């Protein structure tokens, strides 16, 4: 999805890679909105949102795995990249939701923002990683790192102006 004025509106749930690998790129001022979303349910999949005025608005987000779906034993690996002044708005997020899954979110560059109205769990039953670099920012109402007993979480914040703000 590329270019200013280009819009994709999906009122339902969005799966980026359920059983097959998938990539979604939101670039150069494009916008996407949907209900809840999963990146890398039982696959290795990614979403990249890049460029000023590029945005993705989603409901609850799972990055890497989906513990509610037991139809496959394949662990999910998901990555969300928010780059170069792009914005992602959501309600809540779990990174590494299912056992043996991996979920990674990278927020890089001045003006790049991941804004959540609720909390983010970095490491559900699997492994979660967040990297906030070079002036990137996350805002949320709570954060859990290594939320579940079998999970693990790692958060790295580096570079001038980089911030994770919990209110």
Where are these regions (language model features)?
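Sequence/structural signature of small/polar-enriched beta-strand/turn repeats
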Residues: 1-167
